[in-house]
């Protein structure tokens, strides 16, 4: 039972492998978000492709509010670099410190030129060695491939500063029965399945994105497919993040596809 992002990666990899049989495509990043998704090996060398959902989050970094100096500090734990685009965002937020420092879990929109957000995304993925992006347009059942520098033409990008939990993990074995009993008590549970460290719950579709707070910890139900959910334990650590959300706005440009195909020779 694959998660949505993994299923999209697998579908894109299969599509590329079937359409361009003379080229070697291989899954590369897998669940490691610091690495590109697909490696392409041609007779002239290799490059990478990043897979993106047509509506998704695409990058983030932590900014820590300094109440004394009324500035935002770039966290040393960020996986991205403090580049020119990051500095522009920080400078903007510093000018409105009292407004942004109150951001909660709903977040506050960054009212800045979209080109800054798209620029951050392009520079971040260029640093990972990404040359092309691939996405799937559900509206017309079309795979779309375009070069990194065209990201802002294909996706609209919004920036937001909000507080979120720092991550999640598969729930420990000792917590599984507790979560199952809670789902049963609400009449939403049908069955469960364990695959390695992963707990899947089969139940009512209303479980999607449901969060249970049990013994001081939060457990969230991530939808895998209709009626099937992967349960994860949320971290108790909160960070305030600048987050970029993307939304597909353009169909395939044939010249961009030809550019990709030329690089496969």
Region locations from a protein language model:
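Catalytic cores of nucleic-acid endonucleases
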Residues: 51-145, 149-162, 166-221, 225-226
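Charge-dense, extended regions
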Residues: 211-265
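Catalytic centers of nucleases
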Residues: 2-67
């Amino acid at each position: 039972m694959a998660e949505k992002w993994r299923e999209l990666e697998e579908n894109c990899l299969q599509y590329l492998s079937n359409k361009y049989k003379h080229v070697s495509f291989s899954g590369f990043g897998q669940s490691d978000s610091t690495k590109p998704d697909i490696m392409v090996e041609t007779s002239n060398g290799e490059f990478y492709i990043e897979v993106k959902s047509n509506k998704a989050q695409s990058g983030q970094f932590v900014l820590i509010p300094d109440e004394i100096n009324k500035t935002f500090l770039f966290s040393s734990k960020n996986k991205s670099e403090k580049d020119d685009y990051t500095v522009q965002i920080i400078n903007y937020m510093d000018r409105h410190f009292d407004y942004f420092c109150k951001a909660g879990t709903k977040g506050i929109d960054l009212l800045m030129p979209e080109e800054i957000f798209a620029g951050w995304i392009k520079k971040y993925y260029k640093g990972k060695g990404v040359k092309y992006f691939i996405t799937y347009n559900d509206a017309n059942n079309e795979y779309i491939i375009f070069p990194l520098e065209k990201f802002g033409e294909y996706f609209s990008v919004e920036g937001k500063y909000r507080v979120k939990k720092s991550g999640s993990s598969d729930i420990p074995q000792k917590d599984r029965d507790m979560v199952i009993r809670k789902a049963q008590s609400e009449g939403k549970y049908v069955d469960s399945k364990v695959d390695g460290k992963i707990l899947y719950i089969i139940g009512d579709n209303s479980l999607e994105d449901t969060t249970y707070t049990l013994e001081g910890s939060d457990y969230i139900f991530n939808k895998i497919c209709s009626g099937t959910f992967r349960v994860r334990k949320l971290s108790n650590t909160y960070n305030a993040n600048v987050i970029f959300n993307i939304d597909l706005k353009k169909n395939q440009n044939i010249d961009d596809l030809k550019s990709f195909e030329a690089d496969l020779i």
